[in-house]
Amino acid sequence: MVADVLLTHFNQLFCLNDPGHPLTGQEMKKATIVEDGYIAIKDGLIVALGSGEPDAELVGTQTIMRSYKGKIATPGIIDCHTHLVYGGSREHEFAKKLAGVSYLDILAQGGGILSTVRATRSASFDNLYQKSKRLLDYMLLHGVTTVEAKSGYGLDWETEKRQLDVVAALEKDHPIDLVSTFMAAHAIPEEYKGNPKAYLDVIIKDMLPVVKEENLAEFCDIFCEKNVFTADESRYLLSKAKEMGFKLRIHADEIASIGGVDVAAELSAVSAEHLMMITDDGIAKLIGAGVIGNLLPATTFSLMEDTYAPARKMIDAGMAITLSTDSNPGSCPTANMQFVMQLGCFMLRLTPIEVLNAVTINAAYSVNRQERVGSLTVGKEADIAIFDAPNIDYPFYFFATNLIHQVYKKGQLTVDRGRIL
């Protein structure tokens, strides 16, 4: 077979034989590091990879040849938890945060999520589209090729649908692949204050059926937290969503452990998010139910909290984990997955191999794209992040700098030395 593109002489390729399930426990410590590696691409797919000189049959008169001495290649990075589409920003709350006002106290004062809800409700489709596109551009420049994007800053049907429509439009227009999550249960809207059940009924009866019918989202999520939605309320919504055919996620055990992990396990959610306050019993329940733990260390960093999710304990117990930005205007205003990956080492005490597995193959399973992306594997799409680094440890050791040299998306050179092509 003659390749369309042949990428050769990488210092290292980060490869993996996809086992057919998210990596758990000791599996997360394993990878195949190919020295002097090459990747052959045809019709947007990986058709061969190996070490040394490529087979002669891969090279034709039209084959594009590129050499990458001094560089490494990983699968395209996957950010599987973002709140991508929103209006406004919340830097005006930064002084309060520095003064020690808590996240929940800011929310109780009408700020936080509710502040962004007001800004998003007043924002036009074009405003939201352009703002979200800029964030996606930034992510792409940092090696991200697939992104999960939630609604949740409307808390009414008109605005929630506008957010989902923006995601759908960007999925068509932007190189990054987007996976949509419906999260109208992100907070209790002011017009339903004191009556969350009534709001959940509106979501179940009036919103979810339309989202499903119009194929606006693949996943449904809820914020199960003290002073937001209880475990029973979360179970009520997610069980109805599951009956309608949605895959499930749940924000759980971020600030307090109030039963969200139990709901995730009972309903076989794909993932439980945050988990800073998870208990040993909660870890065991998620492992037993096969729920992926999606950890968001940049949120803990941004909130200036001391308690990070117990990633080391989770992996050692046999759990599958992912790492994501939680990109949002309040608790985590970043879109930099390289920073998150570095926090995975510095604050969660994971190894570079564990982090790379978390943000590639496990993240692919988390967004239900494992058949297409998540590993440098023959037959998968050629989503490739190329780092200006001599080995896979270097991007973690040399932190706070964008080390992306190039990005390939579906076999096309999409980013070249800081420019989107």
UniProtKB/Swiss-Prot annotation:
N-formimidoyl-L-glutamate binds at residues 153, 328, 330. It catalyses: 4-imidazolone-5-propanoate + H2O = N-formimidoyl-L-glutamate. 4-imidazolone-5-propanoate binds at residues 90, 153, 186, 254, 331. Its EC number is 3.5.2.7. SUPFAM superfamilies: Composite domain of metallo-dependent hydrolases, Metallo-dependent hydrolases. Binds 1 zinc or iron ion per subunit. Keywords: Cytoplasm, Histidine metabolism, Hydrolase, Iron, Metal-binding, Zinc. Its cofactor is Zn(2+); Fe(3+). Belongs to the metallo-dependent hydrolases superfamily. HutI family. Catalyzes the hydrolytic cleavage of the carbon-nitrogen bond in imidazolone-5-propanoate to yield N-formimidoyl-L-glutamate. It is the third step in the universal histidine degradation pathway. PANTHER family: IMIDAZOLONEPROPIONASE, IMIDAZOLONEPROPIONASE-RELATED. This is Imidazolonepropionase. It comes from Streptococcus pyogenes serotype M1. The gene is hutI.
